[in-house]
Amino acid sequence: MRRKECIVNYRHLLLVAVIFLSSCYHDEVYTIKDLDETMIDLRAYQENLGDEVKAGKLQDAGWLLEGMDSVFTEIKKKFKEHRKLDGPFSSYYNIKMKKPIRMIRQAIEDRDTSLAMSGYKLLVNKCNSCHRDNNIDKDVNF
């Protein structure tokens, strides 16, 4: 009888060990976008932002601006270096993007469509200057 109890206890121990070890294994798949794919997301926000500003729909432009800026934030975190960039993306953001984004944000808060349009044009020009600086053959359009 004692041997039978040991076998049962051994099986329980084995079962618990298998369950424990299988719970430790996580095979999570993460989608990792490269810079080009992330820029495509950014482009969608940027183009729609321009459409809303041109139409004078500043409330809609506001959430698009925040979405676009959140994509910029992710790019700053993710691309501290990249083969297409001479430095971290955050330096380009700070030098080129921060001012037009602040300008558009302020214009939206003040409900100033003219200033929002000026900020948007500045944003597009800064995007294109960054592309030229890094020999990227893609233009951002108004």
Where do the language-model regions lie?
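Bacterial N-terminal signal peptides that target proteins for export
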Residues: 2-13
